[in-house]
A protein has these predicted regions:
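Glycine-rich active-site loops that engage anionic ligands at enzyme catalytic sites
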Residues: 1-216
Length: 216
């Protein structure tokens, strides 16, 4: 892992991470940083790790501990004896999204092909964020990679299954959003009010088109 650290306000440090790390390695990093004293929050994305400290914690003093953890975790990853407990999620989807026809047109595919490609890909949780329980799932099939919508919607319905860039994801709650809507998750909630986010870094996710449950 890259060890370059920069202050992020007066209560946090941010480290830039190298390209190519998988979700499991990010999960190990998250758990190592979260266990440090005076750390109140850790956000690990594909490109950065943000470590938020409790108010009043000396920034420079915490830097050394964070740098040591980054170095230790990085060095241990190839032979890490304790791998994180990764889970696999199957998400049933009703492919009724408002943008399905538009995505098919932009991709040069039929709507059925879009559904088959999206549901036929295995995804990994690359990052968590944006909303509680929202998982950025990679890697979307290149045939479906599109930029975000030019004008975000003021309200995306809860449980919408959507795509943007190389990612797909499920909106846990209704919110503004600029992703392309392909469908609606059925019988799946990305956020549990008691337990928090259902998915974690490194977890695997597969979407199943409604009506094809038995085929899977």
């Amino acid at each position: 892992m890259a060890l370059a650290l920069e202050p992020f306000g007066d209560t946090a440090w941010r480290a830039r991470l190298p390209e190519g790390g998988d979700g499991a390695s990010r999960r190990v990093l998250f758990e190592g940083l979260r266990a440090l004293p005076d750390v109140v929050d850790v956000v690990v994305s594909e490109h950065h790790a943000l470590v938020v400290l409790s108010p009043g914690t000396p920034l420079e003093g915490a830097r050394d501990a964070i740098a040591r953890t980054l170095a230790r975790v990085s060095a241990a990853l190839p032979d890490e004896p304790t791998q994180p407990q990764l889970r696999e999620h199957r998400v049933l989807v009703r492919y009724d999204g408002a943008d399905l026809a538009e995505v098919a047109l932009a991709s040069g595919l039929s709507q059925g092909e879009v559904v088959a490609i999206h549901a036929g890909t295995a995804y990994e949780v690359a990052a968590m964020g944006f909303l509680p329980g929202f998982a950025y799932l990679r890697t979307l099939d290149p045939r479906l990679v599109l930029p975000r919508r030019p004008t975000p919607r003021p309200r995306v319905p809860a449980l919408s299954v959507a795509i943007a860039g190389p990612y797909t994801g499920v909106y846990p709650f209704a919110s503004p959003g600029g992703w392309h809507l392909l469908g609606t998750a059925v019988g799946f909630a990305p956020f549990d009010p008691r337990a928090g986010a259902v998915m974690s870094l490194g977890d695997r996710v597969r979407f199943v088109a409604e009506g094809e449950e038995e085929a899977r």
